[in-house]
């Protein structure tokens, strides 16, 4: 009889053992992200990541400067946390998101953004929307970063911005890496994304750049119209007469006389800001604004610009001041600047398209033309990018 009773007993014991191990494994899996859940609640869920990798884009959008660092949901999620984490500054007061606010198309309304210990940025903070969709791979106004990956950790190491400069007694980036390594939620996030807890500058760059490249806006009035026509030059059926006029003025090159005065054609904006991405031409010189934001002298090296998409917010107002100095606050003033270019002494890098026949261009604009271009620029504003939670601050 013993063999008969022994087998069921062993069988039941085996089942209980397996079930016990299974429960232990499940509990371990749940507890492995306890720090993430404690810090972020439902805003970051490793089991249900936001969609960054396959958002899609219109068929007419062809430019892409990703260059091998393709977006994944996991790395972009980690990039989002890094982007908004004030722990990335020396005194835990400033994050990337402090100077690039979602409600302003990831730009800033301040002329110079506030850094650590009352430091100020040397140039106005550039909007980040659609940074991926450009032939220009370099970043910063002066293009000093060869890639977005390189750009992402330079503000962290800037003495005035986030402070890990290694200058005047300040800590270096290696101190930050150790600091992050000791935060429980980063231990879990890096383990989740990379399979280990090692934190390096290249990993910060990889994740931050993926998050920034994921920020896209293609639900504007312009996009609705562009999807209905075969070519950019055709009238958009959803545009007003004024908006279509402004589009034509934007796209058409101007005709100049020998003195550089416009006698016909459009404004030629698309020569540097080509549709449909409205990104900056990589071969562009500066635009004639050569002042410094908070220092004397001139700076002729600002040849980069953000996309003109979402230049204006959903309220019809600019998403902060324009140009590297932040010195232009209205679309009227921006168009006025290009309407009459002054050839300043020492500006050897002025874009040649702005000095026809050796003269600073005079577009000879009338108010109807200005109003039409303004109306067109406002059609480039999307909506979802301002409120989509996958780009929002996960710490709030």
Residue ranges and their predicted role:
Residues 1-10:
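Bacterial N-terminal signal peptides that target proteins for export
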Residues 18-22:
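C-terminal motif of bacterial Sec signal peptides marking the signal peptidase cleavage site
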Residues 26-154, 223-339, 343-347, 388-396:
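Short glycine/threonine-rich turn/loop motifs
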Residues 138-181:
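Glycine/proline-centered hinge or cleavage motifs at structural transition points of membrane proteins
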Residues 173-192, 196-219, 327-396:
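C-terminal capping alpha-helices of c-type cytochrome domains
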